[in-house]
């Protein structure tokens, strides 16, 4: 099972505050553990929402709103994508994360859908999705 581990933004991350060297070292050590355990698929920190945009959908209409966005509790500051056996294992890993912002922090864990979760998808569509995923993984492996 794949899980997205979402580091929630706060006022400091939205202000663009940089982690200290000690915080960076602690996070690097944690990421190293994930890699050595063979569970890390991806992981990145994100710039503040002031460097982003939102696209709102209403039928065929698209509306773009540039950041920053006011509600920091709805924003994310970073993520990991992990391959694990269960939600319980994901929780155990997340409990070991160094505090990502050095103060009040929150991390959300969400299971990622697989093609098997979509009962209305035809076999042809599932096969096409697998081919696209294989192509994506091959490109990622090339660096």
Question: Predicted regions span which residues?
Answer:
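Conserved, structured core segments of small domains
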Residues: 1-143
